[in-house]
Amino acid sequence: MSIELDLQLAVENEHGLPSEAEFALWLTRTITPFQAQAEVTVRIVDEAESHALNLNYRGKDKPTNVLSFPFEAPSGMEMDLLGDLVICRQVVEREAIEQNKPLQAHWAHMVVHGSLHLLGYDHIEDDEAEEMESLETEIMQEMGFTDPYLAEKE
């Protein structure tokens, strides 16, 4: 089993960000139950880049916490490239405070959530959302974090 991480830090200050080892662990714990080999780029960005990407790809005129860009290999070509995650530092930090969550747990949740999107999971329909949230909760708890949706369930 091997998950290859390409970590890109496109922020002014790297202080307080999770380590490359933490990002790699979160990816590995999320992806390897579904596929043994994968390459994922995780790009940490500021609000301006997140906003521009969110507007361009989703038509939403604001920054967002995580964007997932699954890689689609040309027909007949086998590659381990799963895709890219773009995570906005300021949004993650702000949401952790607003949702009263430990910052490290929220970073981990964004990696888990985004990775599941790369694997084909979605939350557009209620049944899909329930399945995806259940998986996220299970993975987070296996890594020692609390249920990321606990506040919404109370």
Curated annotation (Swiss-Prot):
The EC number(s) this enzyme carries: 3.1.-.-
Cofactor: Zn(2+)
Pfam families per the UniProt record, alphabetical: YbeY
Keyword tags: Cytoplasm, Endonuclease, Hydrolase, Metal-binding, Nuclease, Ribosome biogenesis, rRNA processing, Zinc
GO cellular component, one term: cytoplasm
Entries under InterPro entries matching the protein: MetalPrtase_cat_dom_sf_prd, YbeY, YbeY_CS
Catalytic EC class: hydrolase
One Gene Ontology term of the molecular function aspect: RNA endonuclease activity
Entry's cofactor comment: Binds 1 zinc ion.
Positions that bind Zn(2+): 113, 117, 123
Protein name in the entry: Endoribonuclease YbeY
Organism: Vibrio cholerae serotype O1 (strain ATCC 39315 / El Tor Inaba N16961)
